[in-house]
């Protein structure tokens, strides 16, 4: 879904901006136990983003936002941005759309407070974008766990340890897709795009001293 937000976000405001191509792979080791996953290691992830940011800075871009749509990238992107902003002496930032827009997302969803995995939210957004990929007659078979330990992404924890998705869910889903709808997906997409647009146009955010 993250490929959708830059064009939508740019459409929300009139100043000049460019949306670059999305990176097709990221850090997904936690999904490897479920199969059909392509993941890269941190060194590759960092090298790719470093090359992209270096190119943009050399071409005169004054602000760079690395927009993320995958939970497995969040921790690494913080480190990437910290290192590249210093190396290139440029305002390089990152955000994850479903964390940035979480307050608005929570108001739209019925069965969960944030985006999870193949859930009410993600299924709704896919229904809005490529409905031919979704067979809602099978939704009942794709209901995933909603145990308390599976906290909302936007929550906080005081400690962390790595855990594979297979330890959490037998089929990869976390959440309940049965209440998903294309109408809800369109609202989620628009709310997320608007949140990204507000960040892009937040002059104070970009003027923060390094």
Predicted regions and their residues:
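Extended, histidine- and acidic-residue-enriched regions that form the cofactor-binding/catalytic faces
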Residues: 1-65, 71-210
